[in-house]
């Protein structure tokens, strides 16, 4: 944060510290001051969701922040929610030696990923000793005598800690958005492709503006909003071209269309197992697959989904290819 403060100072950006609320279009109140401006950009991020009446207590029931700064390693750990964050923590704590149970109410872990990748990820986690349970909800969770008691499928199990990884919602409390009539959707601010909210002159970027909640997406949204506010034309955000990475063991990276979302669209699917790659064999990391999805008629690359060692370093090639609307034929002619 000190580095960011220096950047602000270097670029002559005036910083006001305090709780802010938007009192009207073009007016923001910070403490006793009212700041007048032509445009307002909301970048307040997101906050962790609780699970119904089950709240994060910071002791035995953790959110992501508490899970990153534990005072002791839990011998038995329950993770509720198997999205990217839940899977990352499952991999991390299992590598440290915890006995990990990963619980997901959806039919498969990593519900945002292509189902082939999700299935391979579940197998990989299970092989590493993680107890993966899908299609299973949590009936109850409570801290009891320094431990956590969880009720799953009618059975009460005991853990040393639990991580709630059930998603986030935009941090909008106290901003005054309801009074202004700013449109919301499932806890996030609704924006157009130029990041403007339903109220002209008010913009939103980052996690508060909705999924995917990724830092590189927020940075790009900031560029779009700044250029728009400055009166410059800029290409709007194309959400189908945002790469996502999960830093688990093995890693997962993806961009574009998932096969299960194609409907009746004619596709050409490519699957390449990493055990057929010489470098993977030599390095001893043969686990995983690269899956590509092309339009069967035009040959356009529509999606790429990867699982394996260091695949987060490979996704950028597919990101560029999709951005340039590259075809299967053009990729085949490319020397990598």
What are these regions (language model features)?
Residues 20-21, 35-45, 79-80, 100, ...:
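Short hydrophobic core segments
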Residues 1-39, 132, 139-148, 157-159:
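Feature captures the FAD/FMN-dependent oxidoreductase FAD-binding
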Residues 57-74, 156-233:
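FAD-site-proximal beta/loop scaffold in flavoenzymes
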Residues 230-231, 247-258, 263-336:
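Flexible, glycine-rich terminal cap/loop adjacent to redox cofactors
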Residues 24-52, 62-64, 69:
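Glycine-rich active-site/cofactor-binding loop and its immediate structural neighborhood
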Residues 1, 5, 69, 74-78, ...:
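Rossmann-like dinucleotide-binding cores of NAD(P)H-dependent redox enzymes
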Residues 61, 85-89, 95, 171-172, ...:
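Short glycine/serine/threonine-rich phosphate/pyrophosphate-binding segments
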Residues 17-19, 24, 44, 63-65, ...:
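Short loop/edge segments at beta-strand edges and connector loops
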